[in-house]
Amino acid sequence: VRLLEKPALKDSHRGPAQLRGTLRHQRHCTCGEVAAKCPVWGPVLAWLPSHDNQPLAVKLKKLMEGIAPDASASGSASWVVESYQDDFKLPFLEDPSLEIRVIHLTRDVRSWVHSRSRDGRKRGHWLPGFIPLLRWWRMSARHEMQLNRCGKPVFRLGYEELALRPEQTLRRLCDWLNLEFAEAMLAPVAQSSSHILAGNRVRFDAERGSTIYYDAEWMAMGASVAQLALAWPPLAALNRRLVYSAKRR
């Protein structure tokens, strides 16, 4: 969705705006092609500049035109995945012709705060994890409330459960999506059929993508503000409910 939204003038130097121009002939998609030749993104990126004032739903339907043939040819259940982490825009939420399910992926508060406060620790800031802790609490509580009200099936998935117990977690997720689990899912980069133009650079790292990997650096650290904050029952309950309960509805 972020790539489809009309870029603001102040963001003309950023990826979404640049991909409407020459960058689409340089940046590679995870399918292996440069963006301009990607069977999914290529036609859309060429079409967008003259249609950027169209509603987001129209743009999404244009994008899905390039995905639909692969989905129908597979002969099994297929899902189009939109995974921009800060995105709560669902233009098709009320479209009766589409089945929409939500996977709510949440990272343990201690791991998230440790990662977000890294720069503050290097600069010697006092309590560098305090602001990230408040942000995790605010965002996670808000997202849980929004998803409880969205009226769609929601699968609660903990980042730690996925990374530390990948096969068990993926089998449970596949069952929920009516998909058959395949061992190849445990090697995400090598077996991916995705079309991703922006995001974590590890998506192109074949070695690191050969398995699902978890950075457990935070576990070796001493007591942090996030670890101490888990002594507060409401925060501990939210972290447990979103990350470790394996709850779905």
Where are these predicted regions, by residue range?
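Alpha-helix initiation/capping motif
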Residues: 49, 53, 129-132, 220
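Short, compositionally biased low-complexity segments
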Residues: 30-39, 110-113, 202-211
